[in-house]
Amino acid sequence: LFCGPRGVGKTTCARIFAKAINCLNPQNGEACNECESCRSFNEGRSLNVHELDAASNNSVDDIRNLIEQVRIIPQQGSYSVFVIDEVHMLSAAAFNAFLKTLEEPPRHAIFVLATTEKHKIIPTILSRCQIYDFNRIKVEDGVEYLRYIASQEGVTADDEALNLIAHKADGGMRDALSILDQVIAYS
């Protein structure tokens, strides 16, 4: 269970984990980006990673459809990774429908649940999860990454402006990148 404020990288980390765990030639725990599994992931055609946005797909039927997918053995790589974003939005009935699968998953299935509101997840689900807390990104780290992105885009960026963007984003890299993108677009 990845917990933390919006925009700090929970879903991105879940995707990176899903890619790395299925890499056929991992290097120091990192995905190689060259094997067929990594290439299919990078091109958006991996059949081993399944994402469910529980904010809009939160019914028992949505979970039952996911449970049906869990039964399918991966065609490439070792694992099927199921990322359930905004998991706190599942209905109580959907949580209960999911519980047995979470308790006794097939060997090839890994679930990564992401939430901004851990307190809304029923205790029976929480007790079956390893919990990882994500924190807001420090302003100086945000500035450093924004500087990197600006240089990659060939954009000259003033440190004071990057600092202001990082402050306005309040520790959310997604928001910082969105603000930077808007500033670049209107410059």
Regions found by a protein language model. Name each.
Residues 19, 43-47, 62-65, 78, ...:
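Extended, largely alpha-helical regulatory/partner-binding modules appended to the mid-to-C-terminal parts
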Residues 1-131:
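P-loop/Walker A NTP-binding region and its immediately flanking N-terminal helices
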